[in-house]
């Protein structure tokens, strides 16, 4: 993701909660990465990619042109995330990985999964299902989009955003030794998919070498840079015709609570509503330590829930 962002600087966060650097900005949302462009902070990888594609930069854009290509790109995004490929891939992590033996990591995963604990019996059911889903995903790509031997999904000269959307969960899990049983999922069974994964890895490695390395900075330095940069996005509006606006009589400047609806939903942000439309909600945080030094957080509407801050406790969702 850092390669795709072409970030000027980065501040690595711990793999488990807490993340005090984000908390100081008033952000309780627990999934990473997040992207800051000035004092605007973007949540969720899909929204981050959309924002980066909108920027006017010298580097060529990776997004598709034309309605048919854009449709393939979008469908691959849905395929990987909403279609369950990533979540199924995560269920195939080998149990002997050091991080999975760490009690702190195990406790954090329970929190991430909204309190659900997985028993040994659960895994005997889940793992065969997950193998089948990944095998089916590989077969789908092998026999359709990659069937004619093309290098890249959209027949481009280099990987496009469509390739990124489709390859990343498979690239991730295929690179973990012992995750995929070779009699079910392998380069022998799916040669075109594995060749695509290998091409993608080579392209990423080459891109990393050709780009300036982002500067590593401390959390305090990141916060200073963010708060002194000003906002990069223009002010939006709360769409009065949006069904959510009508249902809850939402108004700009009112406190709202925003949280993801799938995982990590116990970590909820509270902020003042700045704008809302069918694609995105923007709210301004007010950190406990310094209420006037917040940021404007952008979250996608898809996969997130928004409510008046004083009504959240009554929601059983």
Model-based region annotation:
Residues 3-110, 249-250, 254-260, 264-268, ...:
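GST-like domain detector, emphasizing the conserved glutathione-binding G-site
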Residues 49-53, 74-77, 138, 142, ...:
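Non-transmembrane alpha-helical segments in soluble domains
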Residues 63-76, 118-120, 204-219:
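A short, terminal or domain-edge coil/loop segment
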Residues 80-84, 96, 148, 200-208, ...:
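Short secondary-structure junctions and interdomain/linker hinges
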Residues 84-195, 202:
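GST-like fold's C-terminal all-alpha helical module
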Residues 168, 204, 260-262:
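Generic secondary-structure microfeatures
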């Amino acid at each position: 993701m850092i390669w795709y962002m072409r970030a000027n600087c980065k501040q690595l966060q711990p793999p488990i909660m807490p993340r005090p650097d984000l908390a100081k900005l008033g952000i309780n949302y627990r999934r990473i990465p997040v992207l800051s462009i000035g004092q605007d902070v973007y949540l969720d990888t899909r929204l981050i990619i959309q924002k980066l594609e909108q920027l006017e930069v010298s580097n060529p854009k990776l997004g598709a042109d034309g309605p048919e290509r854009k449709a393939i790109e979008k469908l691959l995004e849905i395929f990987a995330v909403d279609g369950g490929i990533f979540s199924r891939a995560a269920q195939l992590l080998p149990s002997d990985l050091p991080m999975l033996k760490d009690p702190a990591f195990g406790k954090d995963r329970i929190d991430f999964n909204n309190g659900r604990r997985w028993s040994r019996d659960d895994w005997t059911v889940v793992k065969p299902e997950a193998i089948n889903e990944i095998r089916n995903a590989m077969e789908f790509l092998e026999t359709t989009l990659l069937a004619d031997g093309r290098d890249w999904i959209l027949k481009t000269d280099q990987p496009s955003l469509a390739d990124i959307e489709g390859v990343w969960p498979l690239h991730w899990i295929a690179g973990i030794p012992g995750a995929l049983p070779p009699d079910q999922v392998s380069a022998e069974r799916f040669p075109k998919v594995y060749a695509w994964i290998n091409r993608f890895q080579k392209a990423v490695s080459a891109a990393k070498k050709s780009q300036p390395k982002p500067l590593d900075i401390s959390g305090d330095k990141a916060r200073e840079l963010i708060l002194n940069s000003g906002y990069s996005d223009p002010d939006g509006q709360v769409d009065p015709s949006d069904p959510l606006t009508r249902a809850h009589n939402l108004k700009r400047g009112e406190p709202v609570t925003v949280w993801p609806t799938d995982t990590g939903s116990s970590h909820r942000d509270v902020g003042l509503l700045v704008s809302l439309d069918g694609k995105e909600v923007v709210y301004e945080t007010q950190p406990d330590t310094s209420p006037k030094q917040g940021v404007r957080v952008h979250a996608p509407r898809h996969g997130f829930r928004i409510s008046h801050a004083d009504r959240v406790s009554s929601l059983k969702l």
